């Protein structure tokens, strides 16, 4: 597990409320139960990387990138839901997270079109491949991938936490699978789609990916 504590849920609850209130008409249901349900999910014991620390980082990065989004509060809601369902040994986490958003958000007061947009954004995190005119998608995907551009110690914490989430995978199989993912990322013409992400994160992210790929080739497991 990374050598730091996750943020306190109380620090995140107001951020949920602001995003929800910014996306719905006044007078909707109390936001707190919805926040508490999501916060409980983000603190499940099987998580090592996909924790409140990751959620906070994605929200912080959306704050940096918000001018590039069409509806930044919907992007923030998508961040809350994008890993709300997370089991490392399952492949349908994003789809199940999108379904959760489709059930919860209309009850919380969002319109059908806005709910559909949040669910679409959640599903986009399967590929992290937003269209050139998908400003909301570009912001969410860049915010989610920004960890790739972290300073070396934080990136090392990230890779350690990912390995811990996949502790059930044998070392050799993990190395092969992780290396394939890193090569796929390095083969992309652009990791980041917003002007800010491309300018500030692209080069450092590629350096981190190349370093990890080299380490995977020589590490014993």
Question: Which positions does each model-derived feature cover?
Answer:
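Divalent metal-dependent phosphate-bond-processing catalytic cores, especially two-metal-ion Mg2+/Mn2+ enzymes
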Residues: 1-25, 43-50, 61-71, 81, ...
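An amphipathic alpha-helix signature
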Residues: 13, 17, 32-36, 59, ...
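Short, well-structured alpha-helical segments
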Residues: 31-39, 52, 72, 76, ...
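Histidine- and acidic-residue-rich, metal-dependent catalytic cores
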Residues: 41, 97-131, 183-185
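Active-site metal-coordination segments of metallo-dependent hydrolases
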Residues: 44-54, 86-98, 112
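His-Asp-centered metal-binding catalytic motifs of divalent-metal-dependent phosphohydrolases/nucleases
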Residues: 58, 73-88, 97, 122-126
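Short, flexible active-site-proximal loops enriched in glycine and acidic residues
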Residues: 68-74, 90-93, 110-114
């Amino acid at each position: 597990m990374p050598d730091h504590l996750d943020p306190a849920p109380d620090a995140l609850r107001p951020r949920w409320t602001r995003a929800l209130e910014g996306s719905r008409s006044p007078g909707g249901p109390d936001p707190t139960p919805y926040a508490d349900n999501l916060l409980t999910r983000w603190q499940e014991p099987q998580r090592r990387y996909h924790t409140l620390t990751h959620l906070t980082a994605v929200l912080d990065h959306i704050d940096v990138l918000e001018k590039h989004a069409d509806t930044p509060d919907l992007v923030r809601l998508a961040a809350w839901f994008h890993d709300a369902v997370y089991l490392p040994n399952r492949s349908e986490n994003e789809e199940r997270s999108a379904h959760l958003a489709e059930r919860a958000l209309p009850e919380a007061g969002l319109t059908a079109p806005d709910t559909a947009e949040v669910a679409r954004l959640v599903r986009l995190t399967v590929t992290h491949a937003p269209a050139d005119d998908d400003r909301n998608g570009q912001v969410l995907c860049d915010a989610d991938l920004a960890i790739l551009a972290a300073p070396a110690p934080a990136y090392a914490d990230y890779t350690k936490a990912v390995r811990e989430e996949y502790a059930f995978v044998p070392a050799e199989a993990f190395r092969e699978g992780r290396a394939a993912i890193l090569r796929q990322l390095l083969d992309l013409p652009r990791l980041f789609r917003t002007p800010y992400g491309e300018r500030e994160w692209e080069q450092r992210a590629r350096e981190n990916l190349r370093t990890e790929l080299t380490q995977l080739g020589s590490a014993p497991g």
